[in-house]
Amino acid sequence: MIASRGAPELPVRLVADYVVPCEGQGRIIPGGAVDIDTKGRISAVGAASELGPGPAPTVTGGLLMPGLINTHAHTPMTLVRSVGDGLPLDRWLKEAVWPLEMRMTPDDVRWAMALGSVEMLLAGVTTSCEMYLHEEAVVEGVAQTGARLVITPGVIAGLAPGGNVEPRVDEIAAFHAAHHAPDRRVSVGFAPHSIYDLSPAQCGEIAARAQAAGALFHIHLEETLAEREQVIATWGAPATRLLADVGALDGPVLAAHGVWLDGVDRRLLAKAGASVAHCPQSNLKLGSGIAPVGDLLGDGVNVAVGTDGPASNDDLDLWEEVRLAALLARGSTHDPEAMSATVALDLATRRAATALHLDDVGELRAGAWADLIRLDLDVPAFTPHRLETLITQLVFAGAARYVTDVWVAGKRVVADRAIATVDVAKLMAECDRRAASLREA
């Protein structure tokens, strides 16, 4: 556990060569410091020389910034990592992924979620938004590692007897009442799979339950052109307009992918205050397309990044998504100014927190949770580095391998590049065994 590694008692002061608060302005504090109080929240951020007396520094050098936030993941798919390569989305799901996932037990999900959570923490990802089944096991898996979790249990009509999802929605409502506890690192939402799996009316009913609970409504939206065409053929309108018609956009909404959204769709999402989770690697690997991120941002839609599942990515390194989001925004428009490095970094920090309706993560500021990471800058990829280019270097050279330390709510869960909470070798061995059993079943 963390304490066994000699983690210092709170309060603590972390001092770094640079602090990047990620407030949206690209501000960098040279010789910065972050104070963490006894409750695991940030009490002060600024130049170390200006903060006044405080605890002796426990970390010095490098760069401190907020922990990254993965806004769309199916992390327990670590057990089916890389299956079905080369198949389009529909066949990939039906032929390769779902048959294996349907054999996964809650114990499988618990181990697989813990494995993915470790992978993310080592990459500096402190929060993930999970759309998955066996939600109790997902919570238990993350509890072992010390990460922050937004769990949005899935609703899939194809798994419900006769397509009746009402009992499942009742389960999720009860789960929300029992487990939604942001102060204990767990937030709960509702996740209808998609409007091509569920009817518009069902999506509206699920959204109403989410809105009544003040919870996030998390749905796959316009991931492929085939999906868009199918929904129009079946229901007479694109998915976003159907969701608006049934009131599904009237509360907190997170739409995953958004690759084929048109101008009307984007304006509806913007008016509703909805967010889009952009998953560029998964969309490219599955041949789904490239989301119009520049148009989304231009129309006022909040955009963040996610990895999607490790079966379609195939890792959980969010730095890759940040970099690819910026590259695709520029390359697809032939405009090197289409997305600045500051905006790209925001997609995994401040904007990601907004997407998940988490008010106290994603920035380093007084009162926020002390979810933060340290990067080693004493490496070739960051040499030379200058104040005026540092954000650009974070976006285009940043990677999991440069993350040395990670704190969640003030607890140091990664220390000197090692997980401080679980036995990683045992975890990997058990997941290897369980993955082999799934394939052989």
Regions found by a protein language model. Name each.
Residues 1-32, 36-41, 346-441:
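Active-site microenvironment of metallo-dependent hydrolases
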Residues 79-111, 118, 145-166, 224-252, ...:
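Active-site gating loops and adjacent loop-to-helix segments of metal-dependent hydrolytic enzymes
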Residues 81-147, 170-182, 432-436, 440:
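Alpha-helical scaffold segments that flank or form the walls of functional sites
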Residues 137-259:
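Metal-coordinating catalytic core of metallo-dependent amide/deamination hydrolases
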Residues 223-272, 284-297, 309-320:
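Catalytic core of soluble alpha/beta enzymes
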Residues 245-252, 294-379:
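His/Asp/Glu-enriched, well-ordered alpha-helical/loop segment
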